[in-house]
A protein has these predicted regions:
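Sec/Tat signal peptide C-region and signal peptidase I cleavage site
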Residues: 20-26
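A short beta-strand signature within small-molecule sensing/ligand-binding domains used
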Residues: 104-112
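Short glycine-/small-residue motifs
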Residues: 122-123
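Juxtadomain coupling helices with adjacent low-complexity linkers
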Residues: 27-40, 128-165
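Flexible loop/coil segments at beta-strand boundaries within sensory signal-transduction domains
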Residues: 115-119
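Extracytoplasmic/periplasmic sensor domains and loops in membrane signaling proteins
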Residues: 73-101, 141-145
Length: 165
């Protein structure tokens, strides 16, 4: 009897997960090419001037929203909800240095994103080309330099969402 109940309970949980999968898969993410805001202009400039990067992602809370998302990137993931790592970087001012487990040729550095006054307004994730043994501290310094460079161009968080010129 216990085994039947255990199996039924397991199936109910499994069925619940399966039924949620289409809802999660239905999350509609925007294309970088269609993202006509200032933050995307900044992301495009960073990618054009840093050939050592594979990915750049800017994360912030859009005025009027309650959920923080990826607001600009070279990937078609615009609007992707921030995960707990993204939120830890922006809310707790943490820095993340991490090799990509699935692709050992990539190394991610995530740091808080600042505006020109130094206020934290989100996070920036920079994914570098990587070979085992590369200098991770150098990548961290490069990510900080990228962040500091674009911070000078951001008067406040609202500016990120203004139409691109």
């Amino acid at each position: 009897m216990f085994n039947e109940w255990k199996t039924q309970a397991g199936l109910m949980i499994l069925m619940g997960c399966v039924s949620l999968t289409p809802a999660l898969a239905a999350e509609k993410l925007g294309k970088a090419a269609d993202n006509a805001i200032y933050a995307q202009t900044l992301a495009n400039e960073v990618m054009a001037s840093h050939p050592e990067l594979v990915v750049i992602g800017l994360h912030a809370l859009k005025p009027g929203n309650t959920v923080e998302t990826m607001i600009a990137s070279n990937l078609d993931r615009i609007g992707k909800k921030d995960d707990e790592d993204d939120l830890a970087v922006s809310h707790e001012r943490k820095t993340i240095l991490a090799p990509n487990i699935k692709d050992p040729t990539k190394f991610e550095v995530a740091v808080p994103l600042h505006d020109a006054s130094g206020k934290t307004i989100g996070s920036i994730s920079a994914v570098f080309k990587y070979t085992a043994g590369d200098d991770e501290v150098k990548m961290h310094k490069a990510a900080i330099a990228i962040r500091d460079d674009i911070a000078k161009k951001i008067p406040d968080a609202a500016a990120l969402f203004k139409p691109a010129k």
